[in-house]
Amino acid sequence: MKNNKVLVVVGPTAVGKTALGIDLAIKMNGEIISGDSQQVYQGLDIGTAKVTKAEQALAVHHLIDVRKWTENFSVHDFVMEANRLIKEIIERGNVPIIVGGTGLYIQSLIEGYHLGGQKNHQAMMELRETLSALTDEELFEKVLKLNPNFPELNRRRAIRFLELQTFGSTDENSGSDYNFLLIGLNAERKVLYERINQRVEQMMSEGLLAEARTLFEKAPDAQAAKGIGYKEFFPYFSGEISLEDAVELVKRNSRRYAKRQLTWFRNRMEVEFEDVFSETYPDSVFEKVTQFLN
């Protein structure tokens, strides 16, 4: 039965999540929900590597172009919207497929955080950063003080436990009603970084600079302007650095972001990664998905 099953495709930037998501949607009668914090913004197409119109014609996409530049889109917004969409997609008899690299979005949806708006979200993020900086010994010491019989000393579960002790949860959203299959994509670091560099060059040839300049002129302080691929050009527009330096900043920040994404998914979520250059890929993914759905 497919009635409560959701596919989730995660991984670092430039690894090939979009292509796999579309293939899965075509083969499994699915609809895609974007799990990317920047693709919600209208008009920011190149720098966010947003699905093209041609790609959108191949499969139904949701949470693309749903906010203006000047509007915020929080984790709370994503969880509420994604839950609504999952329910609607399943009611249509289709398979929901979450595709994205924003780890906090995906984790919050799967684990059912009750974020309660921006204030609670900010406090939770501060606590999470503090807990993540602790050594295993320090983290588990905190857990065992509260629960000496904690069943499994696992970093992800320990952090989750301490967050729930601090913020609690509500019946409204204390956990997900859905069964998720997480599909993680990865590639050898050297290869991934080269793909990232090449993609930035491609974005430049497609008009990224003009897109960034428009954002700089119209909404430089908006949440949308804080994304990688835009903010790096602002010092160039102000005459502080060269264009070459700005492009190198985009590449460097994108590589660092990819590393952070992988760290997040490995440490905080139970993801089995597939090497996109493996001889068995993507057949191995389709086999797992078929078994999961049936």
Curated annotation (Swiss-Prot):
UniProt catalytic activity: adenosine(37) in tRNA + dimethylallyl diphosphate = N(6)-dimethylallyladenosine(37) in tRNA + diphosphate
Listed transmembrane segments: none
One example GO MF annotation: ATP binding
Entry superkingdom: Bacteria
EC number: 2.5.1.75
Binding of substrate, residues: T13, A14, V15, G16, K17, T18
Cofactor(s) demanded: Mg(2+)
GO biological process assignments: tRNA modification
Site (Interaction with substrate tRNA): T102
Residues at which ATP binds: G11, P12, T13, A14, V15, G16, K17, T18
Keywords from the named record: ATP-binding, Magnesium, Nucleotide-binding, Transferase, tRNA processing
Annotated function: Catalyzes the transfer of a dimethylallyl group onto the adenine at position 37 in tRNAs that read codons beginning with uridine, leading to the formation of N6-(dimethylallyl)adenosine (i(6)A).
Subunit details: Monomer.
Family that this chain belongs to: Belongs to the IPP transferase family.
UniProt protein name: tRNA dimethylallyltransferase
Chain's gene name: miaA
